[in-house]
Every structure is written in C-alpha cells, then in structure tokens.
Amino acid sequence: MTMKKSNILGIFVGLFIGLVTVLGMSLFIFINLKFNSVYYAQHIPHKEGTDPDVIMLMENMGWAYTPEIEGISYDDDGSYSITREKGTKTSVLDLTGDTLFFHSESNDRYLLNRNFSVQHAFDKRYHTIKYNQRKVQKEIRETVQPVIDAQPKPLINLQWLFNLALSQQMVDFDEK
C-alpha cells in the first residue's frame, strides 16, 4: 500500500514541477516578447510604408525600454505618447486605442490608422489641410527614432517566435 502511495505522490510532485516549469517558461516568453517587442518589430518582414517598430513602441510603451533621452519625454496615463522637443520645436506622437495622433513641429495635426495611413490632417485652427503621406511618416519617424535606436538587443532572442505570433497581425496592417 505504501508503494502505491509513494508512486501516486511521485506522479503528483512530477506533474506539479512540470506545471510550474511550463508556467515559468510561459511567463518568461511573454515578458521577453513584450519587453523586446520594438527590437523584434524592427526585424520582422513588413511592407514598405508600414512601421511595425513604431506601432510596437506605442502599444507596448509600458513594457518597452524608454530611456532618459535629452529632449524626449513620455506620457503613459490613459494613452501612450512620446514628445520630442528640438530647440523651440515640439512634436508629439500619441496612441489611443487604434488611432495615432501626430502633432508635428509645424503645428499641423494628423490622425492616422495603425498602418500609418493619414485619415485626417488639420492646421492649428483645425482647418483641413493637404499633406504629403511620406513627409508625415518621416516626421513621425524623426520623433520616435531616438527611442527606437536605444532599444537593447534581447539576451535570449525569440525573433522567430515573435514573427510567428505577429506575422498575421503585420499582414493585417499591410492590407488595411
């Protein structure tokens, strides 16, 4: 009888250790993918004109590395935004839900969808203005590039898993 009890106890201990190991590995993978999402997004195949690294930075700003950089400030209370001050000029990129808001150095304002297509463009008096899509994307890139450049390389690189997990999401960005 004691042999059966010890076998059953051994099975339960083995299952418990296995469960804890799987949960620990899952937690590590989740944290790794979130914390390094900007780095991974820089290296994921994507259609030209889409900026998955900028999207990952804005979506995961609470997880991603946001170093102290002169002229850059972060706001993550309610929405995620990055402000860049360059001399007397200021630009702000903000993500709320699925909408990006960009306030350019020239005081123009743009509402963009997640694949960086401008939906609306306004001047400082909120009159509709004409815009150049590439110029707006370039200005957005200039606003956040110092933060993207500061992202560390992961200690354990799970690029393949990031690509697998987000490849469909990136395809969806490209098609919208």
Which residues does each PLM region occupy?
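N-terminal export/targeting and maturation segments
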Residues: 22-105
